[in-house]
Each structure stands twice: as C-alpha cells, then as structure tokens.
C-alpha cells in the first residue's frame, strides 16, 4: 500500500443518496476512512436515524417538492432516486459548483486497478485525479 505523497480531495462536492441504510452506511464509512468531505441526502422521516451515526452538518434533507414534482415517466408508484439526484444537481449549482459527484449508499471501498493489481484507495486523491482528467475536455 502506498502511503506517501500529497493527499488531495475532490474540488467538486460529493453527494451520497441514501434511503433506509443508516445502519450499514457503507459509502459514508468508506469516505470517512478516506477523510473525504461529503453530504448525504436523506428523506426527512429518516433524518434522526442517520443523525445518530453521521455528523448532522453532513446530512441534507431532501425537500418534499422534489418528490412531489418528479415525473418518473412510468405508472409505477415509486420515484426511485430521481428526486434526490435532481436535488443534488440543483444544490451543487446553487453553491457554485460546475460539476458534482453522486454516489450510491452501498459502496464499501474504493480502489483502482493497475497492471492487474487492485490497489485500495485511502484518500480522495483518486477523485481529484478523475476531475483533473475530465477537465481537460469540453465534451465530458
């Protein structure tokens, strides 16, 4: 495991969309181990459960209007993660971000593969490297 070098975090905000997983919190635990900033988006009725485990400053409550105004283009009852995704996008724009990271709540660890070798990632540097790569191009 490499432990030397400059550690960096992403420039763009990182959001985790979560529902009903306050007990497992895989992605937030992984990001905490990496000392990476993030916000987790939850519905209001689950706020207290998440707040027992996650710093309240990191928790964003999904405004009801995003659920009520969401058109899932289907006859199914649920909206899925669409409302939360739209909220994250608008939240990022309102806070001056030109891009943002949107993560599911079931990621146990982050890593990269080089020459057929899996390397466990221990900082946000990998996100920053991806941003640097993407920002070289105008159509990404």
Regions found by a protein language model. Give the residues of each.
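Short, conserved clusters of charged catalytic residues that mark active-site
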Residues: 23-26, 83, 125
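Short internal beta-strands
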Residues: 39-43
């Amino acid at each position: 495991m490499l432990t030397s070098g400059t550690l960096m975090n992403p420039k763009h905000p990182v959001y985790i969309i979560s529902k009903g997983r306050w007990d497992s919190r895989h992605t937030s635990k992984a990001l905490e181990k990496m000392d990476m900033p993030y916000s987790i988006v939850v519905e209001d009725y689950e706020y207290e459960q998440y707040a027992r485990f996650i710093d309240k400053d990191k928790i964003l409550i999904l405004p009801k209007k995003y659920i009520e105004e969401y058109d899932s283009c289907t006859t199914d009852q649920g909206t899925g993660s669409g409302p939360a995704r739209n909220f994250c996008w608008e939240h990022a724009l309102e806070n001056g971000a030109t891009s943002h990271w949107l993560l599911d709540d079931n990621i146990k660890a982050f890593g990269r593969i080089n020459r057929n070798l899996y390397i466990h990632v221990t900082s946000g540097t990998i996100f920053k490297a991806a941003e640097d790569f993407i920002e070289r191009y105008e159509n990404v």
